[in-house]
Amino acid sequence: MFLLYEYDIFWAFLIISSFIPILAFLISGILAPISKGPEKLSSYESGIEPIGDAWLQFRIRYYMFALIFVVFDVETVFLYPWAMSFDVLGVSVFIEAFIFVLILIVGSVYAWRKGALEWS
């Protein structure tokens, strides 16, 4: 039978952890100064006046490499617990992990063939 009172501490933690950031934003909005002078609108470069254009555009290639990094970072997050409990889980979980890695390899090869990893 599913008993909800077993999760009381979870709900208390969820409510408190949601309330603290909201409270922090409200307090900073109330206590923060509201002046919008020229110093507030200028960009900050190591305490000196900025020279040249302070707004630079990043090349889209940086985002592609960051996206590929996130994919393999998520793969690590999923495969590490699996590797730590490999002897307990059995063959079916091994096949699922193998299919997961195979899908990631196929996606990486596809991105490589399409030129997503080229820097030109």
From Swiss-Prot:
HAMAP family from the UniProt entry: NDH1_NuoA
One Pfam assignment: Oxidored_q4
Cell compartments where the protein resides: Plastid, Chloroplast thylakoid membrane
UniProt record similarity statement: Belongs to the complex I subunit 3 family.
Record key words, sorted: Chloroplast, Membrane, NAD, NADP, Plastid, Plastoquinone, Quinone, Thylakoid, Translocase, Transmembrane, Transmembrane helix, Transport
UniProt GO molecular function: NADH dehydrogenase (ubiquinone) activity; quinone binding
Function, in words: NDH shuttles electrons from NAD(P)H:plastoquinone, via FMN and iron-sulfur (Fe-S) centers, to quinones in the photosynthetic chain and possibly in a chloroplast respiratory chain. The immediate electron acceptor for the enzyme in this species is believed to be plastoquinone. Couples the redox reaction to proton translocation, and thus conserves the redox energy in a proton gradient.
Protein name from the UniProt record: NAD(P)H-quinone oxidoreductase subunit 3, chloroplastic
Annotated GO biological process: photosynthesis, light reaction
Classification via InterPro entries: NAD(P)H_OxRDtase_bac/plastid, NADH_UbQ/plastoQ_OxRdtase_su3, NDAH_ubi_oxred_su3_sf
Transmembrane segments: 9-29, 64-84, 88-108
Swiss-Prot/TrEMBL catalytic activity: a plastoquinone + NADH + (n+1) H(+)(in) = a plastoquinol + NAD(+) + n H(+)(out); a plastoquinone + NADPH + (n+1) H(+)(in) = a plastoquinol + NADP(+) + n H(+)(out)
Signal peptide, first to last residue: none
Highest taxon of the lineage: Eukaryota
GO cellular component term, pick one: NADH dehydrogenase complex
Membrane topology classification: Multi-pass membrane protein
Subunit structure: NDH is composed of at least 16 different subunits, 5 of which are encoded in the nucleus.
EC number: 7.1.1.-
